[in-house]
Every structure is written in C-alpha cells, then in structure tokens.
C-alpha cells in the first residue's frame, strides 16, 4: 500500500506519515541519541536530566531545522524505548519534567529536595 502512494515507511525523517501513523524510525533514532546523551551526562547529573536540557543536547547534535527535536519528540522516543524494556522514565518534579536513566526509585525526601532545587 505504501509503495502505491510513494511513501517509504522506514524513512528516517519526521514527516507527515511518520507523525500520523507512528511509522518510520525517526523516534528510534532519537531514542538512541537520548541514550547516548544520558550516558555522557550521567557523571554530571547522576542519571537525572531535565527534559529541556536533554532536548537542547539533541538540537546541538542535529544541526538542521528539518531534524529539529521537540520535547514531544523526546517523550515519544522515550515511550518507544520503554517498549524495548528500557529503564528510561519521565518523571515530573514540581513543574518540570526530568528523564531518569538509572533504575533508582526516588522517595518523598528525594522528590522534595529536587522540587526545591528546581525553583532556583
């Protein structure tokens, strides 16, 4: 069916069909880059990076506007990673979203401290 209308479902771009049908490997590609960024920054942030900072790292890696990455793209990519058994998780602390890349549970005290820290 895709060949009849000239669409390659495995094309590595964020196009109309990939967005509409959830096909293509754009989000898996972003997922791999998310893993790379989280691994590179883990020694600085302990495995907890703000979604905004993560997206900024990805935008620096992907120079062209056509390949710009939004926070929604990151969230979708992380949800695709979960399907593969990944331990990456998006958590909300205060009003900010963070990506946790370590399998550690945060207790109430950790959450409270992080919430206070996000205010500054």
Swiss-Prot record:
This is Putative vacuolar protein sorting-associated protein 22 homolog 2. InterPro entries: ESCRT-2_cplx_Snf8, Snf8/Vps36, WH-like_DNA-bd_sf, WH_DNA-bd_sf. Belongs to the SNF8 family. It holds the Pfam family EAP30. One of its GO terms (biological process) is protein transport to vacuole involved in ubiquitin-dependent protein catabolic process via the multivesicular body sorting pathway. PANTHER family: EAP30 SUBUNIT OF ELL COMPLEX, VACUOLAR-SORTING PROTEIN SNF8. GO terms for cellular component: ESCRT II complex.
């Amino acid at each position: 069916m895709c060949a009849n209308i000239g669409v390659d479902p495995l094309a590595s771009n964020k196009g109309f069909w990939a967005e509409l049908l959830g096909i293509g490997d754009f989000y898996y590609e972003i997922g791999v880059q998310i893993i790379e960024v989280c691994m590179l920054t883990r020694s600085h942030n302990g495995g907890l990076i703000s979604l905004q900072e993560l997206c900024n790292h990805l935008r620096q890696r992907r120079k062209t506007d056509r390949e710009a990455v939004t926070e929604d793209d990151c969230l979708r990519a992380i949800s695709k990673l979960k399907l593969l058994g990944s331990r990456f998780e998006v958590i909300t602390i205060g009003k900010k979203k963070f990506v946790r890349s370590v399998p550690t549970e945060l207790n109430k005290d950790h959450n409270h401290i992080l919430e206070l820290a996000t205010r500054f």
